[in-house]
């Protein structure tokens, strides 16, 4: 829905006048009539700025009414003076200033002189300002005066010299002040912006008042104006050269420099030459004027930095006049020089802001070039046409930057490309674009790019704008479908949709402007709409979602009329194609189209209904669809609309309530979010439309003409709104029942929260609904009970809702219940279960808002502070929180005191972290900016800090232990205290920094440490068993100790971080105002430093890191310089400590440097990102020098620390693009570090390298390791990291030289792996041009030599790495050269490693060639033919003469690739008859034919067998093709009969061969079953008579994978073909075969095998029953039992899915048959399984089980005929229908007598209420993280209520055969006994059981409701029975 945003109310600050001005106005104002003075006086007395604006607008009419003689009126003079003073006093951004200027622009001519005098007077006063920090106001005023304000401009003209003088002074003063504040970032930033404004004002002065500075007069070099201009020029050149200034200041200085030079330089036509000389560094000082050299000496003489050159280029492009070649040949030369300079800078400037500037300036250059092109500039046309060098280099820039990580660079690349096309188009204006070779070549190259290249989309769009869509489509008609197929990737979807929009819009324009004006729409639909509809129906979830979000709205906007075509097509197939859980189907596509159309205003729902576009039933079907997104689209159709005040119809409200019933329990967070968001839109619409309805009601008498409009009865609609919202809230509160799932609670609370927020009472508005009126004490209790949820987001939502309703909530709570809640919170805050303290925190935060908290609850715990009670006006929350924190603090201080004596007792009885967590939570509720009890808070803060240190000291020995978490050794004998001694000994730190140098002598080391411990840590009162609060014995476990200590540390860290946030209040003038002192902050910093630098565990330093980040962020925002400098001091200290390599260093030296990288990360993250990032630069420089190997032999520790810290920094997303300039250096350090002899350095280098690969190529976005999504072109890579080109080339050469083929010695260079890994991430691009200085060719020979490595993996990687360095058209030549390098069979020296490496390289190159888009190209075919011929000459390598099986396998893999490709293009394949003959020869001579001669395992044997098998299968597939089999040509007959059959493969003794053969058979079988026989006709002949072979394999096959495949093939076969053969193949009859299938499930341990066996056995059962063949009762019973077993909640998903599939297949036959086929008990047991599957936690299982009900509904519809049936549904609806269908079946079978008691048993539950409620054994209590039920989706009460609903309906049915009275009495007695027991158990629970015994309370509450429901049905049945008995008696 498009909700129009309410315009923000403009805040206008009112102006006021001083006493003197007011007196002056009062003297002139007249009471009897309004004059100018009285108007101004009235205006000044207004306090509202908006009203003042209205008042000022009345000034001009009043002034214009005055005659010319009034110019001498002192009143007018006084008023103009006041107006001038007011104008200059107003802030620049105040709208009043603009309104005043606008009004004064209308001043009559005769008053101008007087007004100018007044303004000049005011401006002169302004220019006298001497305070640097007040300059900004003057500068703003000068800028305002020149901005469309006649008076202001006239005033500046009058004071031109004074203004110039002020500007010179301002520039110098601000620069000086900036230098004196070096290091004070806040002040410097402000001064920089002031300096920027001063430069801008100077430029405005020169641009807007040119007449004052041009002409002969001022160019006298002695004149003041000339001197002033010289000074301004000097300042601008100084600022331009000053690298310490902000980049924006330097950029603007570049503009100013060119502008000032242009104004001063003569002759003007020589100016371009001067700029060219500066840019090219020719420094022709003699030809430059002396004044220029004197003022800009540095620019003329020094070597200009890259940034200065860039800003000079920008200045020249922006400030010189390029239009129509006005600067002549010099201008053309300058234009080309600028391009040359910019392109040379592109390889140097890699820092993100500079790269962005460069791309923007290049785009400006292309605009200037376009402007400079005129018909009579042939030289420029030659230099700028598409084939020129300049354009070529610019295109290369575009190709290497169109996937740049910065959005701005990508956007500018697109603009550059578009402008380059326009330049070429302008140059070739006379000729046709279609035939132009430049455009043709560019189009071909772009289309041959892969679709994952984002730059392709924008560039193609530009090309479409130039050439037209039709010209592009003529090259490839499938482009629209290709682009739509790309849209399943969200990162590409926006680009794809933009390209599609450009194409279809352009196509439409082409059609409508052409000759086919009447018929174009059908063609347009075929191209753009039909593929869309097909994908919407059948596409995957992501693809359809992104198409609907990005593409569909654009398509409808372009052609709204296409909607009716889309609806017509989809409606026609909606009934037949309803979709499934994986596809939307036509129904889902229809919902999506209608939703989008309605949301964008193309349709209204009333029209949709009335025109029959979709029925209510169809929407209902959509609302409960299996596909989540169809449900959301159906809901969106109801909720979203273009008009925010459109009235919600009754149908919409009914459908929403229907939706809520079945969709609250969605496991998908995104679906829940969308539901809440859409309903929020609906509520907003109800609110907005209700306001309209209230207005209609007020104006009802005027609306009598509207007979049929809703205006007739507004109150009726409002009442319906109220009823709807009330019903909705009832359902939502009902959904918060005991045991409701987390998704249900989340959805219900979110929607209730939206209702409370949207329908909150606002002043002056009647509200249609108020949630607080729906609240009662039971609902309040329900909301408070949500705090007991183990999911924190539920607690958050409940808390927020209670806060919105707190007025009514607290009124409904009595003091006793509040007291119990407080007591529960205090108990939970010290619970040993970690999630209990979170509940306690929410309870305390909730109670803190209660006014009487202190009287009701806190009075028992702490003494009242009389001062606080006296002042009742003080905020309730602050008083309560202060009291709560005091209470918690007192408790925790006492507990810490006890913990010092015995940490173990604390862990078992009162873990302290819960109290601290509650303190933290309470602090979050505080209004920190507005505290009343500052003195008390100061004391509390000081105590909290001390408490934190003490608690940390108690627990840190455990946290900083060297033992991994949880691996504290445990003694089995819990009766002795030795274990506790062991715990405390083990948790002492035992690591030293000898980690790098020597292995630890662990036993001795531990022994010494233990002795020290024994000496220094005598323990008192240690025992294993301790009595807790409830006097029960509590056994201390290691987990308890660990949880207590780790969580305490975490809470302390967060608390200290929170307390640091109190620091900014310290910046006030009075130090006493702050709650925390500077000294305390420094101590906190030292505390964090200690833990970050010395902790060994990631967990420990991560906990400290969270708090430390808060501290550093706070310090960075401080006004106090000493505090602000602290992070920098800490950073320098730690870097020095790392460098020092002192053996006594306390730095933690672990494998990854533990917390040190975190420490440095936190310090750098606090540095402002928009500055120069000096700290980051300094740190990286230091670390790089440490990380790089040096010739001196220092300790390895600093190098390891440096590498680890660099890794952390490169992984830190907060540093963003600021870290990218250092990536190349990082790669070099990592690769060089990998050559270190020290393992620790190599390890850290590897980790750093991995982080850098991710930083460069992005996070892996798929399972495919070599996916092109995580790669980039070689050109782009070396363009972004140019320094890596020479480095990688040199390293590769060194590596290749170590692999000297002449040397027999085995040499492996350590860098080989990393080099090949990074080179393998690159890929070739058709766009790689000839203008790049970095050629890829030099890499190729070295990579080829790397293929000779003795390491298998390296050879494999070299094959992959070679691909990007060989252009596609070069592949055949390279492959031929590699193949020719292979030895002949007669060669003397055969090196198998070299052969293998070469074959792998051939394989990868060939694969890239066959995958390329060159297919069908004549060059491609010739290249392929040459390769096939050459391969034929080396075939000996695939045969027996080659003794190495590994290289034989590699050669065979190449043959398989060729065979598959040639087979797929059979027309081409038939040209290579010799190839196929050779393949047959290779197969006939292979070991599969002649037998395997190897007795023992031989290296590569399996690999060889797999490769030869793949070749056989490939050849079989090709030769089985129908055209070959039926052909009579001798060629075809030669190759039609391969030497090996599939049966031969299936009989192989090697399971690897059998497995591949079975996979091929399965694939062929599925193709046959999928009716692809037309294409795969020949496959049928391969499957003939396989049944017997497969059946015999079932008994013989020992390999599990093969056995599974055999079963799967049999399952997919037609049993009519299989069963006749079982007798002769395996000597079994069908019954025995079924028994054998069932036995597999008992005997196999494989889930896959058992699942397939169940499916196969079930298929057999169905087949036998349908064909009326006898199955023994025992076998059937066994089958049913297996089915039931498969449905257990604990079973694996695959088994559950198998069971669901079986139930679907037997639904018609057994579950809903007219007569019972199996016994009632078995049938009911199977129905119970279906119901269990519908409640499974796994969505896939639920969806599969829902298909059972879909089959049942479809069957019902076909038998019952008319009437609406749900034919595709989600699990909640299916569950409802399952119970309904079962009850109907019981009636149909006449089994209600026997069936109802069984269903009542289900309802009652067969478990004892006491189950799980008995006092647990101590060891059971040890589980600290028990979260209750395992299934987080199933809701027992939901299924109970649904079953109860259907049983009640069944009980009320007429002619019902009731169960026996005795049976009902037995059930009744049992239910009553259980009810009494449940009541007793509930009363036995402690107070507030919902919090203190949540699981037990929930279980009993559920059972209570189940029993009540059961008793209700029993009573009804008994009353019905008695009624029937009475009737019988009568």
Curated annotation (Swiss-Prot):
UniProt protein name: tRNA (32-2'-O)-methyltransferase regulator THADA
According to its UniProt entry, this protein's organism is Gallus gallus
- UniProt entry keywords in alphabetical sequence: tRNA processing
Q: Which family does it belong to?
A: Belongs to the THADA family.
| Entry function | Together with methyltransferase FTSJ1, methylates the 2'-O-ribose of nucleotides at position 32 of the anticodon loop of substrate tRNAs.
- Which GO annotations describe the biological process of this protein? tRNA methylation; tRNA nucleoside ribose methylation
PANTHER family with a match to the protein in the record: THADA/DEATH RECEPTOR INTERACTING PROTEIN, THYROID ADENOMA-ASSOCIATED PROTEIN
């Amino acid at each position: 829905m498009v909700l129009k945003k309410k315009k923000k109310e403009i805040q206008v600050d009112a102006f006021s006048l001083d006493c003197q001005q007011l007196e002056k106005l009062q003297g002139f104002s007249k009471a009897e009539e309004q004059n100018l003075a009285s108007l101004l006086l009235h205006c000044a007395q207004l306090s509202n700025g908006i009203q003042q604006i209205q008042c000022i607008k009345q000034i001009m009419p009043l002034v214009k009414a005055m005659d010319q003689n009034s110019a001498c009126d002192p009143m007018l003079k006084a008023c103009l003076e006041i107006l001038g003073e007011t104008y200059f006093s107003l802030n620049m951004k105040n709208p009043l200033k603009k309104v005043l200027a606008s009004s004064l622009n209308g001043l009559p001519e005769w008053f101008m002189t007087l007004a100018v005098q007044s303004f000049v007077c005011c401006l002169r006063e302004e220019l006298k300002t001497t305070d640097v920090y007040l300059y900004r106001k003057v500068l703003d005023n000068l800028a305002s005066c020149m901005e469309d304000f006649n008076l202001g401009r006239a005033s500046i003209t009058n004071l031109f010299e004074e203004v110039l003088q002020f500007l010179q002074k301002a520039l110098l003063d601000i620069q000086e002040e900036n230098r004196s504040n070096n290091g004070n970032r806040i002040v410097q930033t402000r001064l920089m912006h002031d300096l920027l404004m001063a430069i801008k004002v100077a430029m405005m002065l020169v641009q807007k008042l040119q007449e004052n500075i041009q002409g002969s007069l001022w160019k006298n070099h002695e004149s003041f104006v000339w001197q002033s201009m010289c000074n301004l020029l000097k300042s601008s050149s100084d600022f331009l050269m000053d690298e310490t200034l902000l980049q924006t200041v330097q950029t603007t200085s570049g503009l100013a420099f060119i502008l000032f030079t242009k104004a001063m330089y003569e002759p003007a036509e020589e100016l371009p030459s001067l700029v060219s000389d500066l840019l090219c560094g020719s420094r022709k000082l003699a030809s430059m004027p002396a004044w220029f050299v004197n003022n800009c000496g540095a620019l003329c003489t020094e070597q200009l930095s890259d940034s200065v050159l860039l800003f000079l280029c920008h200045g020249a492009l922006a400030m010189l006049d390029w239009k129509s070649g006005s600067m002549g040949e010099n201008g053309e030369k300058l234009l080309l020089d600028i391009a040359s300079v910019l392109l040379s800078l592109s390889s140097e400037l890699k820092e993100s802001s500079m790269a962005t500037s460069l791309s923007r300036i290049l785009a400006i250059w292309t605009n200037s070039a376009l402007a400079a092109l005129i018909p009579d500039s042939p030289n420029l046309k030659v230099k700028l046409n598409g084939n020129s060098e300049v354009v070529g280099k610019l295109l290369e820039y575009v190709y290497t930057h169109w996937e740049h990580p910065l959005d701005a660079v990508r956007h500018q690349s697109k603009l550059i490309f578009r402008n380059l096309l326009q330049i070429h188009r302008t140059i070739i204006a006379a000729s046709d674009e279609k035939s132009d070779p430049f455009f043709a070549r560019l189009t071909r190259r772009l289309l041959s790019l892969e679709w994952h290249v984002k730059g392709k989309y924008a560039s193609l769009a530009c090309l479409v704008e130039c050439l037209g869509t039709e010209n592009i489509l003529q090259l490839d008609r499938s482009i629209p479908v290709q682009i739509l197929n790309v849209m399943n990737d969200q990162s590409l979807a926006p680009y794809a949709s933009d390209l599609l929009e450009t194409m279809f819009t352009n196509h439409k324009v082409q059609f409508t402007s052409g000759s086919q004006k009447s018929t174009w729409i059908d063609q347009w639909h075929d191209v753009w709409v039909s593929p869309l509809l097909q994908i919407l129906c059948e596409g995957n979830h992501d693809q359809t979602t992104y198409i609907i979000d990005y593409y569909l709205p654009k398509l409808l906007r372009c052609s709204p009329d296409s909607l009716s075509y889309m609806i017509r097509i989809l409606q026609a197939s909606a009934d037949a194609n309803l979709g499934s859980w994986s596809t939307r189907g036509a129904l889902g596509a229809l919902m999506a189209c209608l939703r989008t159309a309605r949301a964008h205003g193309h349709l209204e729902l009333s029209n949709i209904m009335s025109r029959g576009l979709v029925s209510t039933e169809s929407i209902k079907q959509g609302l409960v669809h299996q596909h989540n997104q169809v449900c959301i689209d159906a809901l969106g159709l109801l909720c979203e609309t273009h008009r925010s005040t459109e009235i919600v119809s009754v149908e919409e409200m009914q459908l929403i309530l229907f939706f809520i019933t079945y969709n609250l329990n969605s496991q998908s967070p995104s679906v829940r979010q969308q539901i809440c968001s859409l309903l929020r839109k609906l509520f907003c619409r109800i609110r907005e439309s209700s306001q309209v309805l209230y207005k209609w009601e007020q104006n009802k008498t005027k609306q009598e003409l509207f007979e049929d409009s809703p205006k007739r009865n507004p109150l009726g609609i409002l009442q319906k709104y109220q009823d709807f919202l009330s019903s909705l809230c009832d359902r939502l509160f009902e959904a918060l029942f005991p045991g409701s799932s987390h998704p249900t609670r989340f959805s219900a609370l979110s929607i209730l929260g939206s209702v409370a927020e949207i329908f909150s009472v606002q002043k002056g508005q009647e509200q249609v609904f108020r949630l607080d009126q729906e609240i009662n004490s039971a609902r309040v209790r329900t909301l408070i009970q949500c705090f007991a949820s183990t999911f924190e987001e539920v607690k958050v939502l409940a808390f927020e809702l209670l806060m919105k309703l707190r007025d009514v909530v607290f009124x409904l709570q009595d003091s006793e219940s509040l007291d119990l809640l407080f007591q529960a919170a205090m108990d939970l805050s010290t619970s040993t279960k970690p999630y209990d303290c979170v509940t306690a925190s929410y309870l305390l935060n909730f109670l803190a808002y209660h006014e009487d908290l202190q009287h009701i609850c806190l009075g028992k715990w702490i003494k009242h502070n009389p001062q606080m009670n006296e002042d009742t006006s003080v905020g309730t929350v602050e008083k309560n929180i202060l009291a709560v924190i005091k209470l918690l603090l007192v408790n925790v201080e006492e507990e810490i005191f006890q913990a010092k004596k015995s940490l173990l007792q604390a862990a078992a009885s009162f873990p302290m972290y819960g109290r601290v967590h509650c303190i933290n939570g309470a602090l979050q509720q505080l209004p920190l900016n507005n505290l009343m009890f500052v003195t008390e808070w100061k004391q509390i803060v000081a105590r909290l800090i001390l408490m934190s240190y003490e608690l940390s000291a108690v627990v840190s020995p455990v946290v900083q232990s060297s033992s991994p978490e949880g691996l504290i050794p445990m003694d089995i004998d819990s009766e002795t205290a030795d274990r506790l001694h062991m715990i405390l000994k083990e948790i002492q730190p035992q690591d030293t920094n000898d980690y790098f140098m020597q292995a630890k002598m662990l036993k001795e080391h531990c022994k010494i440490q233990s002795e020290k411990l024994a000496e220094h840590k005598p323990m008192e009162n240690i025992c294993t068993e301790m009595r807790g609060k409830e006097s029960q014995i509590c056994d201390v476990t290691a987990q308890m100790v660990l949880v207590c200590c780790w969580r305490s540390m975490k809470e302390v860290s967060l608390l200290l971080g929170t307390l640091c946030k109190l620091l900014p209040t310290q910046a006030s003038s009075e130090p006493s105002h702050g709650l925390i002192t500077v000294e305390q902050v420094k101590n906190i910093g030292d505390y964090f430093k200690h833990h970050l630098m010395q902790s060994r565990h990631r967990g420990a330093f991560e906990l400290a890191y969270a708090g430390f980040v808060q501290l550093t962020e706070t310090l960075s925002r401080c006004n106090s310089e000493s505090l602000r400098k602290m992070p920098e001091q800490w950073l320098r200290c730690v870097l020095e400590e790392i460098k020092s390599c002192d053996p006594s260093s306390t730095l933690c030296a672990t494998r990854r440097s533990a917390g040190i990288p975190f420490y440095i990360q936190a310090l750098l993250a606090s540095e402002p990102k928009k500055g120069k990032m000096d700290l980051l630069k300094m740190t990286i420089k230091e670390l790089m020098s440490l990380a790089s190997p040096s010739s001196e032999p220092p300790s390895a520790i600093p190098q390891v620390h440096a590498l680890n810290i660099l890794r952390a920094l490169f992984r830190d997303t907060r540093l963003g693009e600021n870290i990218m300039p250092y990536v190349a250096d990082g790669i070099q350090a990592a690769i060089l570090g990998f050559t270190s002899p020290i393992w620790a350095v190599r390890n850290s280098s590897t980790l750093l390298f991995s982080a850098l690969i991710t930083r460069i190529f992005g996070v892996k976005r798929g399972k495919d390791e070599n996916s092109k999504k995580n790669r980039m072109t070689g050109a782009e890579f070396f363009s972004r990291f140019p320094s890596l080109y020479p480095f990688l080339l040199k390293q590769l050469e060194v590596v290749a030289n170590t692999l000297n083929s002449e040397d027999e010695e085995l040499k492996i260079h350590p860098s080989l792996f990393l080099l090949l890994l990074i080179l393998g991430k690159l890929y070739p691009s058709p766009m790689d041009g000839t203008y790049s200085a970095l050629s890829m060719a030099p890499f190729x020979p070295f990579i080829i030599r790397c293929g000779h490595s003795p390491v298998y993996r390296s050879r494999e990687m070299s094959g992959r790495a070679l691909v990007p360095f060989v252009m596609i058209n070069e592949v055949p030549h390279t492959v031929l050269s590699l193949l020719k390098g292979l030895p002949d069979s007669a060669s003397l020296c055969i090196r198998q490693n070299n052969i293998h490496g070469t074959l792998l390289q051939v394989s990868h190159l060939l694969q890239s060639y066959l995958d390329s888009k060159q297919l069908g190209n004549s060059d491609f075919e010739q290249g392929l033919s040459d390769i096939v011929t050459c391969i034929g000459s080396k075939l000996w390598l695939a045969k027996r003469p080659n003794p190495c099986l590994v290289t034989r396998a590699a050669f065979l893999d190449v043959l398989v690739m060729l065979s598959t490709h040639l087979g797929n293009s059979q027309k081409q394949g038939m040209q290579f008859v010799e190839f196929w003959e050779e393949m047959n020869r290779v197969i006939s001579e292979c070991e599969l034919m002649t037998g395997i001669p190897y007795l023992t395992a031989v290296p590569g044997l399996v690999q060889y067998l797999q490769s030869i098998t793949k070749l056989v299968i490939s050849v079989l597939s090709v030769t089985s093709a129908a055209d070959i089999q039926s052909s009579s040509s001798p060629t075809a007959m030669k190759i039609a009969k391969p030497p090996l059959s599939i049966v031969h493969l299936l009989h192989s003794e090697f399971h690897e061969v059998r497995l591949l053969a079975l996979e091929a058979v399965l694939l062929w079988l599925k193709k046959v079953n999928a009716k692809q026989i037309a294409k795969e006709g020949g496959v049928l002949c391969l499957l003939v008579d396989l049944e017997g072979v497969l059946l015999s394999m079932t008994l013989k096959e020992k390999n599990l994978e093969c056995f599974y495949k055999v079963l799967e093939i049999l399952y997919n076969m037609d049993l009519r073909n299989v069963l006749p053969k079982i007798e002769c193949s395996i000597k079994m009859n069908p019954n025995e075969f079924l028994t054998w299938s069932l036995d597999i499930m008992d005997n196999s341990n494989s889930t896959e095998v058992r699942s397939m066996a169940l499916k196969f056995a079930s298929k057999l059962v169905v087949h036998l029953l349908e064909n009326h063949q006898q199955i023994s009762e025992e076998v059937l019973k066994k089958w049913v039992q297996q089915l039931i077993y498969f449905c257990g909640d604990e079973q694996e998903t695959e088994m559950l899915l198998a069971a669901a599939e079986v139930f679907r297949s037997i639904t018609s036959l057994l579950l809903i048959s007219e007569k019972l086929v199996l016994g009632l008990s078995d049938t009911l047991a199977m129905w119970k399984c279906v119901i269990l599957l519908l409640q499974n936690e796994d969505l896939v299982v639920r969806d599969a089980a829902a298909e059972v009900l879909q089959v049942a509904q479809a069957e019902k519809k076909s038998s019952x005929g008319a009437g609406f049936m749900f034919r595709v549904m989600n699990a909640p609806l299916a569950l409802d229908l399952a119970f309904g269908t079962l009850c109907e079946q019981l009636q149909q079978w006449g089994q209600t007598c026997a069936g109802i008691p069984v269903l009542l048993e289900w309802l009652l539950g067969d478990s004892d209420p006491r189950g799980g409620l008995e006092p647990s054994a101590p060891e059971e209590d040890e589980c600290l993280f028990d979260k209750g039920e395992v299934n987080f989706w199933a809701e027992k009460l939901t299924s109970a209520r649904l079953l109860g609903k259907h049983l009640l309906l069944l009980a009320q049915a007429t002619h019902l055969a009731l169960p026996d009275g005795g049976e009902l009495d037995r059930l009744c007695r049992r239910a009553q006994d259980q009810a009494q027991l449940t009541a007793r158990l509930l009363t036995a629970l402690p107070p507030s059981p919902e919090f203190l015994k949540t699981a037990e309370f929930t279980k009993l509450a559920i059972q209570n409701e189940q029993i009540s429901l059961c008793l209700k049905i029993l009573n009804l049945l008994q009353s019905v029975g008695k009624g029937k008995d009475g009737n019988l008696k009568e």
